[in-house]
């Protein structure tokens, strides 16, 4: 089974929280100037310098100064300088259809990189000299040069494939010649020593490049970048994750996933599945769906002592990408559930809703605060995955599943898929903001009319305990095929209508199966939600709360013990501030029956407040 997603050009977000966050990210991307993005590459190529009063670019002189430069990890003195440009290009490749400005800037950046490569001799393209890799090969220290190079090469690859920029592929192919020549004389042991220093997703780049070119030199790079010391022990069942750098390993496994897709060799897939078992099913995740604390994997089944600095944003984003690989291979609902949880309680929770900035970590302990990055003074690795994370979800709702369609996410959006029988199938997912709750705030004509016009149907008296979505499926040619709708694990009940008529719900492997003729049909699905307590695996007396897929944060800066039965979470938390103007507020609650009250809001809405996610709960009566 191989699921096929809509291309970025055939996916458009509808109004709502995700579109708001998408546009916030787009605004941040456009604020980063080409001059700053290119500076480390032009400097290395001898095409830029600064003497204290002005910048000098060969062929032109421009006013410049440190006050306008990028700093933090992008500082001219940082060995990780230049990483953000690669992330930017990867994001831009998926956004050029949504923003002509982004597309034009991306093409300009690629052209300038080609100029830098030519100035470097025709192959080397990097924001630092070749000796950084020579130091790694000699067993000396340099701060992850291949990590940075991966970001650039992946950005060029994405520009070639999704951005349709042929010059990007030319730059990448010439760069591959340098790596082929550099690694050719090395023994397997020497290669393994180099791969022990963070390489990012270089394996994924080489696999994708081999697919594009069919060049055996690129196939050889795939084999050279196979990190046997890690992969073979994974296959043997050894725990090679606990207390290891999580994002290093995830990026390498993404390379295995791509190598499997390109070569068809099942041994690559075996590595991916062994990793998923160790990282997720056999280890457990936090209530958010995320993993890692302080950038390293927490021990299997142990979380209570590691509620600080949880789920590095890079790990969230890259694990979502890995879940997407596995979902496309298998169609299994569990991978879609993982993806959904990490989107809502990771990607959204770690992006400031007003500034668009990223939080490196998402602490879950008592009295936590989110630490937000600065637009130009930090440039953590997570600034880069921030740019890319918000390009993942526009096309997430539906996939082509052979001769069927599989709807795995209820992302407000319009998608177009090329169906073998029905031609172009347009799928529109729209939340019902009057009779259901959806994450975020939703201004809509329907919501406005429901409070303004007395002759239109009213809204429920109280906040509904459900999410409702209307899915319009419109086929160019009427055809008989199967549509599958995922039933989330958090849904306590599900009802479905087709063209207004109720149907018997049959759930098979986590999906409702609708096998019928399709032309222009309306499917309404209602997913019942409830407040649920989730205990820590190693301290079951501490629980976190969710409302459907939404993790709740209690706005309190100290540890407070809640009195009551966690099995009856609805008795502990009561609806609060449930309605605002023309929409229902999702995930807003207050405690009930406690000496001192606590207000709860969605974790993704927390900005500067102190908050707590995991609370001790005692059945002892309130004193």
What are these regions (language model features)?
Residues 1-84, 103, 107-130, 166:
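Low-complexity, Ser/Thr/Pro/Gly-enriched N-terminal "stalk/linker" regions
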Residues 37-77, 125-144, 193-209, 236-255, ...:
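Carbohydrate-binding/catalytic loop surfaces
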Residues 491-516, 531-538:
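Solvent-exposed beta-strand/loop surfaces of large extracellular or lumenal domains
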